[in-house]
Amino acid sequence: MGIAVEARKVYPYPFQHVVTSYLNKYPTPLEKHVLSVKTVEEKTDPATGVVYRKRIATCNNVIPSFLRRCSILKVSNVYLEEESWLDMKTRVMTLETHCLTWAQYATMKEESVYKECTENSNWTEFTQKGTITITGAGFLNRVLETFAQTFLSHGVKKSISIMETILRERCGCPFS
């Protein structure tokens, strides 16, 4: 069946500040479940100037312990792969993230875009769509999807809150 979560937020900060804050957001004491983020590839297209990055995030497994009785869920860490394309000329950063840990049982994808806001060039618009489809877990498919939907919805709100806090700390009061 699958679930989807969408979010939109306008940060009242310039694109460069938001992108820099995003790329340096983790690890942070504001989110104890993200243990590390490591850049494994980075290159700039000489023709377009677009910066491509591939990063791997190591996160705590937050699946409730009663569900971890299932052997496939008994892992301490979950690994996410994020690919991003930063185009400073058009002031757009596009990201695609997916889960590496349970790829044979679930498809978890997030597509995010940060771009200069059309209403105010000192602001940055963020949009995100996340989907999760669980397969191969038998009767647990729907239970895990329900947990995932709750977790993703909460995670998006928390991530936005963390960005707002980091932007205030690093950049001061927002632009109007």
From Swiss-Prot:
<dbReference type="GO" id="GO:0005758">
    <property type="term" value="C:mitochondrial intermembrane space"/>
</dbReference>
<protein>
    <recommendedName>
        <fullName>PRELI domain-containing protein 2</fullName>
    </recommendedName>
</protein>
<dbReference type="Pfam" id="PF04707">
    <property type="entry name" value="PRELI"/>
</dbReference>
<dbReference type="InterPro" id="IPR037365">
    <property type="entry name" value="Slowmo/Ups"/>
</dbReference>
<feature type="domain" description="PRELI/MSF1">
    <location>
        <begin position="1"/>
        <end position="175"/>
    </location>
</feature>
<dbReference type="InterPro" id="IPR006797">
    <property type="entry name" value="PRELI/MSF1_dom"/>
</dbReference>
